[in-house]
C-alpha cells in the first residue's frame, strides 16, 4: 500500500484518485452490513425462523430488482429462481444464504451460532463514468442499501 501511494504520488495523484480510476474501469462497488440481535427467550428461534422463511420462500424481488439466484451454503445448493435449475455448491457447509439480483446486488444472511444475532451483508454496484459523478453515485449506492434493508424489513426490531 505504501509503495502504491508513493507511486501514485510520483505521478501527482493520490490513492483516492487511483481508486476512482479503478471504479471507472471495473465498476463502483459498495458494501455494508447490519447486525440484528433478537432479545428474550425466543430470540434464537426467531432468527432460525427468519432463515427458514428465506430458505423456503426466497424473495422474488428485492428493492425492485428481480432475484435471480439463491445460494444456500447450508444445503450446498445453488438455485436459479427464474428457471428452477439447481446445482451443487462446492464450498464448506455453513448456515448462510445469498441472494443475487439481476443487477448484480448481493445480499447474504448469516446467523450467529452462539447468540440470537444475524448479520446481513450487502454488496451493490453501479457504473462510474467520471470522478465528477462519484459523490452522487456513492449516495445512490448508500440509498440502494437502505432500500434493500427497508424492502426486506430488516430495520425493524
Per-range role (PLM):
Residues 108, 117-119:
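General beta-strand recognition
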Residues 113-115:
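A generic beta-sheet turn/junction motif
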Residues 2-110, 128-134, 138-157:
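Phosphate-binding and adjacent anionic-ligand microenvironments
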Amino acid at each position: 500500500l505504501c509503495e502504491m501511494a508513493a507511486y501514485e504520488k510520483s505521478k501527482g495523484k493520490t490513492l483516492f484518485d487511483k481508486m476512482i480510476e479503478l471504479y471507472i474501469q471495473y465498476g463502483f462497488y459498495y458494501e455494508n452490513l447490519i447486525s440484528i440481535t433478537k432479545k428474550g427467550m425466543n430470540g434464537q428461534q426467531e432468527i432460525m425462523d427468519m432463515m427458514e422463511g428465506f430458505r423456503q420462500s426466497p424473495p422474488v424481488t428485492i428493492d425492485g430488482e428481480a432475484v435471480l439466484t439463491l445460494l444456500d451454503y447450508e444445503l450446498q445448493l445453488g438455485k436459479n429462481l427464474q428457471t428452477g435449475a439447481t446445482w451443487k455448491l462446492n464450498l464448506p457447509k455453513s448456515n448462510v444464504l445469498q441472494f443475487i439480483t439481476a443487477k448484480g446486488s448481493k445480499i447474504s444472511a448469516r446467523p450467529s451460532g452462539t447468540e440470537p444475532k444475524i448479520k446481513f451483508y450487502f454488496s451493490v454496484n453501479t457504473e462510474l463514468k467520471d470522478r465528477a459523478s462519484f459523490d452522487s453515485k456513492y449516495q445512490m449506492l448508500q440509498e440502494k442499501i437502505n432500500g434493500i434493508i427497508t424492502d426486506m424489513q430488516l430495520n425493524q426490531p
